[in-house]
Amino acid sequence: MNRSEKPQLRATTVLGVIRNGKAALGSDGQMTLGNTVIKHSTKKIRRIQHANLITGFAGATADAVTLLDRFDEKLQAFGGQLERSAVELARDWRTDKYLRRLEAMLAVVSADKALIISGTGDVIEPEDGIVAIGSGSMYALSAARALIRYTDLSAREIVTESLKIAADICIYTNDHIVVEEV
Protein backbone atom coordinates (compact mmCIF):
# COMPACT_ATOMS: atom_id res chain seq x y z
CA MET A 1 0.00 0.00 0.00
CA ASN A 2 1.31 3.41 -0.95
CA ARG A 3 1.82 5.65 2.10
CA SER A 4 -0.47 8.29 0.60
CA GLU A 5 -3.30 5.80 0.18
CA LYS A 6 -5.81 5.67 2.98
CA PRO A 7 -6.39 2.11 4.20
CA GLN A 8 -9.88 1.07 3.25
CA LEU A 9 -12.19 -0.11 6.00
CA ARG A 10 -14.08 -3.06 4.61
CA ALA A 11 -16.67 -5.12 6.26
CA THR A 12 -19.94 -6.72 5.91
CA THR A 13 -22.50 -8.77 4.27
CA VAL A 14 -26.06 -7.86 5.20
CA LEU A 15 -29.01 -9.93 3.94
CA GLY A 16 -32.74 -9.52 4.48
CA VAL A 17 -35.53 -11.88 3.43
CA ILE A 18 -39.31 -11.64 3.62
CA ARG A 19 -41.15 -14.95 3.56
CA ASN A 20 -44.62 -16.03 4.67
CA GLY A 21 -45.36 -12.75 6.47
CA LYS A 22 -42.11 -12.75 8.43
CA ALA A 23 -38.91 -10.87 7.76
CA ALA A 24 -35.37 -11.56 8.89
CA LEU A 25 -32.27 -9.42 8.50
CA GLY A 26 -28.81 -10.68 9.33
CA SER A 27 -25.16 -9.85 8.96
CA ASP A 28 -21.75 -11.24 9.61
CA GLY A 29 -19.46 -9.66 12.20
CA GLN A 30 -16.16 -9.13 10.41
CA MET A 31 -14.50 -5.76 10.04
CA THR A 32 -11.21 -5.37 8.20
CA LEU A 33 -8.80 -2.51 7.76
CA GLY A 34 -6.75 -2.96 4.63
CA ASN A 35 -5.80 -6.63 4.63
CA THR A 36 -6.16 -7.15 8.38
CA VAL A 37 -9.20 -8.36 10.31
CA ILE A 38 -9.61 -5.93 13.20
CA LYS A 39 -12.87 -7.20 14.69
CA HIS A 40 -14.88 -10.42 14.42
CA SER A 41 -18.14 -9.41 16.09
CA THR A 42 -19.13 -5.98 14.80
CA LYS A 43 -22.84 -5.27 15.23
CA LYS A 44 -24.25 -4.12 11.90
CA ILE A 45 -27.95 -4.55 12.59
CA ARG A 46 -30.27 -2.26 14.54
CA ARG A 47 -33.90 -2.82 15.51
CA ILE A 48 -36.14 0.24 15.36
CA GLN A 49 -38.85 -0.69 17.85
CA HIS A 50 -41.28 2.18 17.31
CA ALA A 51 -41.52 1.35 13.59
CA ASN A 52 -41.30 -2.47 13.91
CA LEU A 53 -38.44 -2.82 11.45
CA ILE A 54 -34.80 -3.80 11.26
CA THR A 55 -31.96 -1.96 9.57
CA GLY A 56 -28.51 -3.12 8.58
CA PHE A 57 -25.60 -1.20 7.16
CA ALA A 58 -22.53 -1.65 5.02
CA GLY A 59 -19.72 0.81 4.52
CA ALA A 60 -17.99 3.21 6.87
CA THR A 61 -19.39 2.60 10.35
CA ALA A 62 -19.54 6.22 11.50
CA ASP A 63 -21.25 7.20 8.24
CA ALA A 64 -23.74 4.35 8.59
CA VAL A 65 -24.61 5.30 12.17
CA THR A 66 -25.17 8.89 11.05
CA LEU A 67 -27.54 7.66 8.33
CA LEU A 68 -29.34 5.34 10.75
CA ASP A 69 -29.90 8.26 13.11
CA ARG A 70 -31.24 10.39 10.25
CA PHE A 71 -33.47 7.54 9.09
CA ASP A 72 -34.87 7.11 12.60
CA GLU A 73 -35.65 10.85 12.69
CA LYS A 74 -37.50 10.53 9.38
CA LEU A 75 -39.47 7.55 10.67
CA GLN A 76 -40.55 9.54 13.70
CA ALA A 77 -41.42 12.58 11.57
CA PHE A 78 -43.54 10.52 9.17
CA GLY A 79 -45.28 8.26 11.67
CA GLY A 80 -43.26 5.13 10.91
CA GLN A 81 -44.05 5.16 7.16
CA LEU A 82 -41.13 3.15 5.79
CA GLU A 83 -41.22 4.19 2.13
CA ARG A 84 -41.88 7.87 2.80
CA SER A 85 -39.10 8.01 5.38
CA ALA A 86 -36.65 6.26 3.02
CA VAL A 87 -37.46 8.63 0.16
CA GLU A 88 -37.07 11.68 2.40
CA LEU A 89 -33.72 10.38 3.69
CA ALA A 90 -32.59 9.76 0.10
CA ARG A 91 -33.65 13.28 -0.87
CA ASP A 92 -31.61 14.73 1.99
CA TRP A 93 -28.71 12.46 1.09
CA ARG A 94 -28.61 13.82 -2.46
CA THR A 95 -28.98 17.49 -1.57
CA ASP A 96 -27.01 17.90 1.66
CA LYS A 97 -23.28 18.57 1.12
CA TYR A 98 -22.33 16.73 4.32
CA LEU A 99 -24.52 13.68 3.72
CA ARG A 100 -23.35 13.32 0.10
CA ARG A 101 -19.88 12.45 1.37
CA LEU A 102 -21.08 9.59 3.55
CA GLU A 103 -19.96 6.18 2.36
CA ALA A 104 -22.58 3.71 3.49
CA MET A 105 -25.64 1.76 2.40
CA LEU A 106 -28.69 0.75 4.39
CA ALA A 107 -30.89 -2.34 4.12
CA VAL A 108 -34.28 -2.07 5.80
CA VAL A 109 -36.96 -4.73 6.32
CA SER A 110 -40.41 -4.79 7.84
CA ALA A 111 -42.80 -7.74 7.79
CA ASP A 112 -44.01 -6.77 4.32
CA LYS A 113 -41.41 -4.45 2.77
CA ALA A 114 -37.70 -4.62 1.99
CA LEU A 115 -35.67 -1.61 0.82
CA ILE A 116 -32.09 -0.71 0.01
CA ILE A 117 -31.06 2.91 0.45
CA SER A 118 -27.93 3.22 -1.66
CA GLY A 119 -24.86 5.37 -1.28
CA THR A 120 -26.05 7.49 -4.19
CA GLY A 121 -29.33 8.32 -2.50
CA ASP A 122 -31.47 5.82 -4.40
CA VAL A 123 -34.28 3.85 -2.78
CA ILE A 124 -34.57 0.35 -4.25
CA GLU A 125 -37.38 -2.10 -3.53
CA PRO A 126 -36.39 -5.52 -4.87
CA GLU A 127 -39.20 -7.47 -6.53
CA ASP A 128 -38.45 -10.67 -4.65
CA GLY A 129 -38.35 -9.30 -1.09
CA ILE A 130 -34.62 -9.97 -0.70
CA VAL A 131 -32.15 -7.20 0.12
CA ALA A 132 -28.39 -7.70 0.13
CA ILE A 133 -25.61 -5.16 0.62
CA GLY A 134 -21.90 -5.27 1.31
CA SER A 135 -18.88 -7.15 0.08
CA GLY A 136 -20.47 -10.61 0.09
CA SER A 137 -23.92 -9.46 -0.95
CA MET A 138 -24.04 -11.17 -4.34
CA TYR A 139 -23.06 -14.53 -2.85
CA ALA A 140 -25.68 -14.21 -0.10
CA LEU A 141 -28.32 -12.99 -2.57
CA SER A 142 -27.71 -15.93 -4.91
CA ALA A 143 -27.90 -18.42 -2.05
CA ALA A 144 -31.08 -16.83 -0.67
CA ARG A 145 -32.82 -16.94 -4.05
CA ALA A 146 -31.98 -20.62 -4.45
CA LEU A 147 -33.13 -21.45 -0.92
CA ILE A 148 -36.42 -19.59 -1.40
CA ARG A 149 -37.02 -21.32 -4.70
CA TYR A 150 -36.14 -24.87 -3.68
CA THR A 151 -36.77 -25.19 0.08
CA ASP A 152 -39.40 -24.50 2.72
CA LEU A 153 -36.95 -22.86 5.12
CA SER A 154 -38.12 -19.88 7.19
CA ALA A 155 -36.87 -16.35 6.53
CA ARG A 156 -34.49 -16.65 9.50
CA GLU A 157 -33.08 -19.97 8.29
CA ILE A 158 -32.61 -18.65 4.75
CA VAL A 159 -30.72 -15.60 6.02
CA THR A 160 -28.52 -17.71 8.30
CA GLU A 161 -27.65 -20.34 5.68
CA SER A 162 -27.09 -17.76 2.92
CA LEU A 163 -24.72 -15.76 5.11
CA LYS A 164 -22.80 -18.95 5.92
CA ILE A 165 -22.41 -19.60 2.19
CA ALA A 166 -21.22 -16.02 1.63
CA ALA A 167 -18.72 -16.44 4.49
CA ASP A 168 -17.28 -19.51 2.75
CA ILE A 169 -16.63 -17.45 -0.40
CA CYS A 170 -16.03 -13.79 0.53
CA ILE A 171 -12.83 -12.97 2.42
CA TYR A 172 -14.50 -9.89 3.96
CA THR A 173 -17.34 -11.96 5.49
CA ASN A 174 -17.12 -14.26 8.50
CA ASP A 175 -19.47 -16.78 10.09
CA HIS A 176 -20.17 -14.77 13.25
CA ILE A 177 -23.78 -14.26 12.18
CA VAL A 178 -26.45 -12.20 13.91
CA VAL A 179 -30.07 -12.41 12.73
CA GLU A 180 -33.10 -10.40 13.88
CA GLU A 181 -36.76 -11.00 12.94
CA VAL A 182 -39.95 -8.97 12.64
UniProtKB/Swiss-Prot annotation:
It is an enzyme of class 3 (hydrolase). GO terms for molecular function: metal ion binding; threonine-type endopeptidase activity. It comes from the Bacteria. It is found in: Cytoplasm. One of its GO terms (cellular component) is HslUV protease complex. PROSITE patterns: PROTEASOME_BETA_2. InterPro entries: ATP-dep_Prtase_HsIV_su, Ntn_hydrolases_N, Proteasome_sua/b, Proteasome_suB-type. The keyword Hydrolase applies. The active site is at T12. It catalyses: ATP-dependent cleavage of peptide bonds with broad specificity. The keyword Protease applies. Its EC number is 3.4.25.2. Keywords: Allosteric enzyme, Cytoplasm, Hydrolase, Metal-binding, Protease, Sodium, Threonine protease. Na(+) binds at A167, C170, T173. GO terms for biological process: proteolysis involved in protein catabolic process. Allosterically activated by HslU binding. Protease subunit of a proteasome-like degradation complex believed to be a general protein degrading machinery. A double ring-shaped homohexamer of HslV is capped on each side by a ring-shaped HslU homohexamer. The assembly of the HslU/HslV complex is dependent on binding of ATP. Belongs to the peptidase T1B family. HslV subfamily. HAMAP family: HslV. This is ATP-dependent protease subunit HslV. It comes from Prosthecochloris aestuarii (strain DSM 271 / SK 413).
